[in-house]
Amino acid sequence: MSKVVVITGANSGIGLAAAKLYESNGYFVVLGCRDEKKGLSTEKEIGKKSKFFKIDMTDYESINNFYDNLKAEFDKVDIFYSNAGIMYVPFSITKEGHESTLGTNYFGSSYLTLKMLDLMKDVDNSRIIQISSIAMYFIKEMRYEGLEDETIYSPWTWYNYSNLYRTMFSFELDRKINKLKTDVAVVHPGVTRSRLYRRSKPTLGYRIIDKFKTDVSTGVAPVIEASTTSSLQKERVYAPRIIHQYGKPSTYKANKLAYNLQERETLWNYTLDKIGMKDIL
């Protein structure tokens, strides 16, 4: 049986590029997408060694349905690439009561990641890959209060928090499951020419960033490296080598908060309480 890789946000950008590369290397690719039309179109594009399952990362019922469908068809997963994410969106609250950026990028991702362990924990060299961003560096202190408060909401700041929290959660998860056969890695693909930035306003800062965007093929390389290397570097972020933006994959240190074990444990407990999975590990 082929190795199985599951990708969320698989119908565009880095997710789509990764899906194509995995398929070309013999993997069966499960495409997790919110938009059914786009998901089915991607399945057709990838070919017979792929299957689309609908998922909305803001909705735990949708995530549960996705997982149940996955488990009904596959008895194991070799790679889970948690890629789905949004940025610079107007303030809104999800069905689960989270601000939408954090609800999609962090809480939904964490919820699905923990569920995926059941299909991965006994699989040799299985790997969870979490998308992140150097945006995490802009955060200097942890925040737990007011995350659903529209009066203090900042699209960029909440996006930055979502990436820091995702990184910290991943490092802590990897530490907690060190006796299982599954490893966890974090990837920053660089600022690429993808649909993630489609809602960004044409500010001076954005126009400067736009000049330095790299192509998707450069961005996907760290994903493939982190998911297939036989010598995974723990508690490092895989990214393009040159200023985390250009060149071949390398690794670098995360925000220093990600190495604070007390802060990680606090975030871990806070997260499991918010997503209703206190007894998962």
Segments and roles (model prediction):
Residues 71, 104-124, 136, 174-175:
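Amphipathic alpha-helical dimer-interface segment in Rossmann-like NAD(P)H-dependent oxidoreductases
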Residues 90-94, 123, 140-142, 197-198:
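Conserved catalytic-core motifs of eukaryotic protein kinase domains, centered on the activation segment
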Residues 130:
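Carboxylate/His-rich catalytic cores and anion/metal-binding grooves
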Residues 133:
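Residue(s) in the substrate-gating loop at a strand-loop-helix junction
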Residues 90-104, 151-152:
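Short alpha-helical oligomerization interface
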Residues 28, 125-127:
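Short glycine-centered segments of the SAM/dcSAM-binding site in methyltransferase folds
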Residues 108-113, 127, 166, 219, ...:
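Conserved internal alpha-helix within the Rossmann fold of NAD(P)-dependent oxidoreductases
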Residues 1-73, 78-80, 85, 136, ...:
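NAD(P)H-dependent oxidoreductase Rossmann-fold/reductase module
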